[in-house]
């Protein structure tokens, strides 16, 4: 069980909660408004439609394990929370009298680490394995985002249409780019969306079973998935770390789509023309920056997970 590190009184933790709600709302609120109006955004919606954390859950603040919140009896009923004991409150720095008062009224709560580990131990172990394996891999910066192009390959034959996006080079131009480039995609959840004619071109043939051993730290989608691994461990993981992972995923998604074969100028996105040497260089520059951020986030997540396993 994690050591109780600190206590936050009502005004303190509510300030943190408001800050988090504003930070998360900057991304979630426009998505919710678009959804209510029947609108879609080809870049920004992805993190709320592909991933499973709902906007309301996304905006809900959690302190993470080892923090006791005062004046919040309602959280006792939240999943993986429990009331703090009198001894825990004293250990965390409250006077015996104050500890007794809060324990009696049940308004001091914290994350129930033993219950989480008991119920979600498999998720913890898997997350540690996939993050650790990815961290140990050498980054490969030679894919140039070709996975998105492979998903649009032979679009005419496959009758693939994007209602509000055109292919920047047209169907034939897109096919030529795919056919003239090396494709080396290690991420199964990208590879599974390749067009049938493009799948055999991939030098790697990732599967769900090999996912935990094939991810590598330059992959945009592996780096986006750090957000997924983080939110699956809520409330054990604090919301600030989850948001840092989300913002990495947000930036990776933008790079992914700027380098994709679609024309997004009308949406305000300048293309990164990865079919050219200049575009490849720009893509790798941004990819390296994201990879460096991912290294730090994996380390933070692994440090937290290792506390409980």
Give residue ranges: language-model regions.
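Active-site acidic/histidine clusters and adjacent loop/turn architecture
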Residues: 1-130, 267-309
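Alpha-helix initiation/capping motif
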Residues: 54, 160, 166-170, 238, ...
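Generic alpha-helix signal with a bias toward terminal, lower-confidence helices
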Residues: 63, 92-93, 146, 153-158, ...
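A contiguous catalytic/ligand-binding core that recognizes phosphate-bearing ligands
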Residues: 105-210
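Short secondary-structure junctions and interdomain/linker hinges
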Residues: 134-141, 200, 233-237, 252-259, ...
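Short, Lys/Arg-enriched charge-dense amphipathic segments
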Residues: 160-171, 260-270, 281-290
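Residue-level signal for alpha-helical context at structural boundaries
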Residues: 166, 244, 263, 305-308
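An amphipathic alpha-helical core segment
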Residues: 185-282
């Amino acid at each position: 069980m994690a050591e109780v590190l600190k206590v936050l009184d009502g005004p303190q933790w509510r300030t943190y909660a408001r800050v988090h709600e504003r930070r998360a709302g900057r991304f979630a609120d426009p998505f919710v408004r678009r959804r209510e109006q029947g609108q879609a955004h080809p870049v920004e919606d992805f993190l709320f439609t592909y991933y499973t954390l709902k906007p309301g859950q996304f905006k809900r603040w959690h302190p993470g394990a080892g923090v006791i919140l005062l004046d919040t009896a309602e959280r006792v009923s939240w999943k993986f929370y429990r009331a703090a004991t009198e001894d825990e409150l004293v250990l965390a720095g409250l006077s015996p009298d104050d500890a007794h008062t809060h324990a009696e009224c049940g308004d001091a709560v914290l994350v129930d680490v033993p219950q989480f580990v008991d119920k979600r131990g498999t998720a913890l172990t898997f997350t540690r394995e996939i993050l650790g394996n990815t961290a140990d891999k050498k980054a490969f910066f030679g894919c140039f985002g070709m996975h998105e192009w492979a998903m649009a390959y032979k679009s005419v034959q496959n009758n693939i249409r994007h209602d509000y996006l055109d292919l920047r080079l047209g169907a034939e131009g897109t096919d030529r780019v795919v056919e003239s480039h090396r494709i080396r995609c290690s991420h199964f959840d990208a590879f599974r969306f390749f067009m049938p004619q493009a799948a055999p071109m991939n030098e790697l043939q990732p599967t769900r079973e090999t996912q935990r051993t094939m991810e590598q730290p330059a992959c945009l989608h592996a780096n986006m998935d750090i957000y997924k691994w983080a939110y699956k461990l809520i409330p054990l993981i604090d919301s600030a770390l989850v948001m840092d992972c989300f913002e990495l995923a947000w930036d990776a998604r933008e790079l992914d789509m700027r380098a994709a074969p679609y024309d997004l100028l009308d949406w305000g996105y300048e293309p990164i023309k990865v079919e050219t040497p200049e575009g490849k260089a720009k893509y790798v520059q941004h990819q390296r920056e994201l990879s460096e951020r991912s290294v730090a986030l994996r380390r933070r997540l692994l440090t937290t997970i290792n506390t409980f396993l």
